[in-house]
């Protein structure tokens, strides 16, 4: 029996994993009770949504709590795991911008600003794609200030979960529990210095750390 090459394995994975992943996300949403701690509305203005890399699994349901018709792009790395995430989220109506702090960063930054000005919301993992965990990189602040939009912080806290032994301690909810979504009021960082803005975002995203 001929074994698959690395390229063939990846190609197969890109076709199969996103389908299975999207089904699992929907199943876990259906089998968990959802509690939202959030403003009544985020208004009509578009925004940047920030979520830690390790809490990304259930992000579609945080966003669609406010936006029933998704018009959002997520900044996703150009690595293979970024391919898997991008294809999985496409099943929820999410588009992506490919790039990170290490690969395609400037291109992604400029594209993100352009898309925000065109009316898209933008999703960013401030500590992605490779950490350090819970450290806010400059990109989210630069984008918010250049595009003149506010930042909305999202924390996702399941009552029962599996945790992957990875740099981001990636969290996957277990079924038959409660998933709490903590969503902040829009935060204006337009007049703040870089260090102060990053500190504000980090502290806001660690209020319900578990």
Model-identified regions with their sequence ranges:
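A short, well-structured juxtamembrane/interface segment
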Residues: 23-45, 57-58
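General small-molecule cofactor/ligand-binding pocket signal
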Residues: 35, 97, 182
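A generic local structural motif
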Residues: 34-39, 61, 109-111, 167-169
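Catalytic core of membrane glycerolipid acyltransferases/transacylases, capturing the structured
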Residues: 45-103, 147, 163
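A short beta-turn/loop motif at secondary-structure boundaries
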Residues: 40-42, 104, 174
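Pocket-edge structural micro-motifs
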Residues: 36-38, 51-53, 76, 185, ...
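Non-catalytic C-terminal accessory region of glycerolipid acyltransferases
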Residues: 1-23, 27, 91, 106-210
């Amino acid at each position: 029996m001929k074994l698959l090459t690395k390229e063939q394995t990846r190609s197969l994975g890109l076709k199969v994993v996103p389908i299975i992943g999207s089904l699992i996300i929907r199943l876990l949403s259906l089998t968990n009770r959802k509690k939202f701690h959030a403003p009544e509305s985020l208004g009509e203005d578009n925004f940047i949504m920030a979520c830690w890399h390790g809490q990304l699994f259930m992000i579609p349901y945080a966003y669609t709590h406010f936006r029933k018709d998704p018009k959002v792009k997520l900044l996703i790395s150009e690595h293979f795991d970024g391919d898997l995430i991008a294809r999985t989220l496409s099943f929820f109506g999410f588009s992506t911008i490919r790039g990170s702090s290490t690969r395609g960063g400037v291109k992604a930054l400029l594209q993100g600003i352009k898309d925000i000005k065109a009316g898209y919301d933008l999703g960013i993992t401030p500590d992605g794609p490779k950490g350090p965990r819970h450290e806010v990189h400059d990109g989210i602040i630069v984008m918010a200030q250049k595009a003149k939009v506010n930042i909305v912080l999202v924390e996702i806290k399941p009552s029962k979960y599996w945790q992957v032994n990875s740099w981001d301690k990636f969290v996957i909810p277990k079924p038959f529990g409660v998933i709490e979504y903590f969503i902040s009021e829009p935060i204006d960082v337009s007049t703040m210095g870089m260090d102060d803005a990053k500190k504000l975002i980090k502290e806001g995203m660690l209020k319900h750390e578990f």
